Amino acid sequence: MKNIMNTMNLVKKAQEVQSEITLIQKKLAETSVTGKASNGAVQIQMTAKLVPQSVKVDPSVLKQTDAETMEDLILVALKDAKKQADDALTEAFNDLKKRYNLPDNFDMFS
């Protein structure tokens, strides 16, 4: 009987974790991050689920840079936004692991 109760508790915990993961994914889709380059002269905004939202370039930068430099600035801003999105995801899942006492090697994506 004890094994049945343990199994039932495990199934319940798994269902709760799955519900939490769904909520986290929704929250990440609603969370915006902004990557910046050249002190904010180039900005890329995307959701924490990596859906692009906008690209902004200060017009003065266009006058002062060539195409290759502009490409580099866009790439820097994109990488910055991606890092922020990755950090938001990591923070959300680390919090989930703590709340449900999940092991560090628990893979949320399999």
Question: How does the language model describe each region?
Answer:
Residues 14, 50, 74:
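Residue-level signature of catalytic and energy-coupling elements of molecular machines
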Residues 1-30, 34, 84-110:
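Long amphipathic alpha-helical segments used for membrane anchoring, targeting, substrate engagement
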Residues 59-62:
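A short acidic/small-residue loop/turn micro-motif
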Residues 30-56, 105:
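N-terminal intrinsically disordered, cationic/polar leader segments
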